[in-house]
Amino acid sequence: MQRPRPPRPLSYSRSSEEAFLEA
């Protein structure tokens, strides 16, 4: 279950995979 999360700044993205999982 993926809960709605607040939008994060692009600069916060540590890695593409991380961002993809967080999305």
From Swiss-Prot:
Function (record text): May play a role in the lytic cycle.
**Region Disordered: what ranges?**
1-23
- The name this protein carries in UniProt is SV40 early leader protein
**Family membership noted in the UniProt record:** Belongs to the polyomavirus early leader protein family.
